[in-house]
Regions:
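Transmembrane-helix motifs of polytopic, lipid-linked glycan transferases
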Residues: 12, 78-110
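Extracytoplasmic catalytic/substrate-binding loops of multi-pass membrane glycan-assembly enzymes
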Residues: 26-38, 48-60, 71
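Membrane-water interface of alpha-helical transmembrane segments
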Residues: 1-11, 77-80, 114
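Membrane-embedded glycan-lipid processing machinery
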Residues: 63, 72-82
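Short helix- or helix-capping micro-motifs
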Residues: 116-125
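Transmembrane signal-anchor helices characteristic of membrane glycosylation enzymes that use polyprenol
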Residues: 5-32
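Membrane-interface elements of multi-pass transporters and channels
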Residues: 28, 66, 70, 98-106
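Membrane-water interface at transmembrane helix exits
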Residues: 26, 60, 64, 92-100
Length: 125
């Protein structure tokens, strides 16, 4: 299997693990600090405290639009968990891209370097 395919598969596996962990530990309702405010402003598409977080509010509204009012908090929290999982995925790919650029010799990467690069991506993400 070539490095590119292995990198993609490993990245999506890391994403799946992160998604499982985030969704299984997610609050079903609100928790402390600003979470309640963000859930409310995302559900009603209102202005939160400065500086706001317009992209978060729009995504939260998109997720909560498909839920009943009782489940709006769970949907906004699941959107936050999925967003965090995608950030883990892109962090993994960023680390492996940098590792690949550092380890490449003559345009080729050997098996040991591939394992080290993917391992560093998993640990770093």
């Amino acid at each position: 299997m070539n490095y590119k395919k292995l990198n993609n598969i490993t990245g999506w596996v890391v994403f799946a693990i992160a998604t499982f962990v985030y969704l299984s530990t997610m609050e079903q309702t609100t928790s402390l600090w600003d979470c309640g405010e963000y859930i409310t402003t995302a559900n009603k598409l209102e202005v939160g405290h400065p500086p706001g977080a317009p992209f978060f509010m729009m995504l939260g509204r998109l997720f909560s639009a498909f839920a009943s009012p009782e489940n709006a908090a769970m949907m906004v929290n699941s959107m936050s968990a999925l967003s965090s999982s995608f950030s883990i995925l892109f962090l993994f790919w960023s680390i492996t891209m940098l590792g690949r650029k550092m380890a490449r010799k003559n345009g080729e990467i050997d098996k040991n370097a591939s394992i080290a690069i993917l391992g560093s991506g998993v640990v770093g993400a």
